[in-house]
UniProtKB/Swiss-Prot annotation:
NCBIfam families: 3mg. The keyword DNA repair applies. This is Putative 3-methyladenine DNA glycosylase. The keyword Hydrolase applies. It is an enzyme of class 3 (hydrolase). The lineage of its organism: Bacteria, Bacillati, Bacillota, Bacilli, Bacillales. Belongs to the DNA glycosylase MPG family.
């Protein structure tokens, strides 16, 4: 997947259905991306790179597309895939995963079962046992990788405003969150809108 030359919003949509693999020392975790959010850098008031701000914590966001930007929010580790050329702080937050391999280990790591195991940006990273130290690593050159060949394709994609970013003017309301319609592993999915996971893919 080209993380440098494509529009960040398009990358966020294209990532839906892509297989994520994390190879721990004793366990392999896999799953399919069902929810993403695009963050558009310098002008995006909700983005960590808004206004070109650079601090030690956000250094990875300014690296070349395909870098992993991992940051902690409210004790939860959040994983972003950096997009664009070096120096342009755009990226895609991976918000939720439909799990595949390593499910028993995910249940142990999370202390939860069912859809709650990976239906949020801090939930799936804990389920996959991903450490903060992965920040700054290159996707597919470290323990975390994506598989764009053995992937799934959503039947429908919904665009909506991003989660948890009030008071950011127009950026609060822009439809930069992308979800696989009806997939029960999407965060904050109403039960009435849920479908069987297999029915949400082509």
């Amino acid at each position: 997947m080209d993380f440098v030359n494509n529009d960040t919003r398009q990358i966020a949509k294209n990532l839906l259905g892509v297989k994520v693999i994390y190879q721990d020392t004793t366990q392999t975790y896999t799953g399919y991306i069902v929810e993403t959010e695009a963050y558009l850098g310098l002008n995006d008031r909700a983005a960590h790179g808004y206004g070109g701000k650079i601090t030690p914590k956000v250094t990875s966001l300014y690296k070349r597309g395909g870098t992993i930007y991992a940051h902690v929010m409210h004790t939860h580790l959040l994983i972003n895939f950096v997009t664009k050329s070096e120096g342009i702080p755009e990226g895609v937050l991976i918000r939720a995963i439909e799990p595949e391999d390593g499910l028993s280990a995910m249940f142990r790591n999370r202390g939860k079962k069912g859809y709650e195991v990976t239906n949020g940006p801090g939930k799936w990273t804990k389920a996959f046992n991903i450490p903060r130290a992965i920040d700054g690593a290159r996707l597919n050159d470290c323990r975390l990788s994506i598989d764009t060949k053995n992937r799934k394709y959503p039947k429908d994609i919904i665009a909506s405003p991003r989660i948890g970013i009030p008071n950011k003017g127009d950026w609060t309301h822009k439809s930069l969150r992308y979800t696989v319609k009806g997939n029960p592993f999407v965060s904050r999915m109403r039960k009435s809108d849920c479908m069987f996971p297999e029915d949400t893919w082509k």
